[in-house]
């Protein structure tokens, strides 16, 4: 089965391939542009994207949106994570966190799958914001996020280690389970 992943992010595609190729699913990156609405939840953003793309893509496809929610910043950057990353970056987040003791945060990922119907798969991971950027792997906020139970950032982990605990890894596991069950039908 071929599955389009509507994204320009090679890191997301690499992570999805590791989960889905064992099911015989060929994940193909398809970098189509689609509007990302400013909404209250990641789920709303993903559902809008699926509905916008469904008449433009001729194969089953997935999109994914994720956000970093920092407790001391009232959930900021949250649904605006991509925009905030592009504008103030990791240094901007670390500057906002200067002198703040409560560094608790969580990442949330929502994968939307369209096969004639809309299906959502959600994953979350709790952790904290590090005091500085660490690590060379991953992408986005990975160099400043330390998941609970670890002393290293996502950027200091291998793809396999990160996938075993990450928000996207958890959402991909849910999608994998669903696909495994429904591919048989």
UniProtKB/Swiss-Prot annotation:
Amino-acid positions noted as binding substrate in the UniProt annotation, renumbered to this chain: 7-12, 66, 139-142, 162, 167-168
Gene3D superfamilies named among the record's database cross-references: 3.90.950.10
Keywords for the protein's UniProt record, in alphabetical order: Hydrolase, Magnesium, Metal-binding, Nucleotide metabolism, Nucleotide-binding
Presence of keyword Acyltransferase: no
Cofactor(s) for this UniProt protein: Mg(2+)
Active site positions, chain numbering: 65
Residues annotated to bind Mg(2+): 36, 65
UniProt cofactor note: Binds 1 Mg(2+) ion per subunit.
Gene Ontology terms, MF aspect: dITP diphosphatase activity; ITP diphosphatase activity; metal ion binding; nucleotide binding; ribonucleoside triphosphate phosphatase activity; XTP diphosphatase activity
Role this protein plays: Pyrophosphatase that catalyzes the hydrolysis of nucleoside triphosphates to their monophosphate derivatives, with a high preference for the non-canonical purine nucleotides XTP (xanthosine triphosphate), dITP (deoxyinosine triphosphate) and ITP. Seems to function as a house-cleaning enzyme that removes non-canonical purine nucleotides from the nucleotide pool, thus preventing their incorporation into DNA/RNA and avoiding chromosomal lesions.
Name of the molecule in the record: dITP/XTP pyrophosphatase
Lineage: Archaea, Methanobacteriati, Methanobacteriota, Thermococci, Thermococcales
């Amino acid at each position: 089965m071929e599955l389009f992943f509507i994204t320009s992010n090679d890191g997301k595609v690499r992570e999805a391939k590791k989960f889905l190729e064992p099911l015989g699913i060929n994940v193909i990156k398809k970098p189509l542009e689609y509007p990302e609405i400013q909404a209250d939840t990641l789920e709303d953003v993903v559902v809008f994207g699926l509905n916008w793309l469904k008449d433009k893509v001729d194969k089953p496809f997935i999109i994914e949106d994720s956000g970093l929610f920092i407790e001391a910043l009232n959930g900021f950057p949250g649904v605006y994570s991509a925009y905030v990353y592009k504008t103030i970056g990791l240094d901007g987040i670390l500057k906002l966190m200067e002198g703040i003791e409560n560094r608790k945060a969580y990442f949330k990922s929502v994968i939307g799958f369209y096969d004639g119907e809309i299906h959502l798969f959600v994953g979350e991971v709790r952790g904290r914001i590090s005091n500085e950027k660490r690590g060379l792997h991953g992408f986005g906020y990975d160099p400043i996020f330390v998941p609970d139970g670890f002393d290293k950032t996502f950027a200091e982990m291998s793809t396999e280690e990160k996938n075993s605990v990450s928000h996207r890894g958890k959402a991909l596991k849910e999608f994998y389970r669903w696909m495994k069950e429904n591919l048989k039908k």
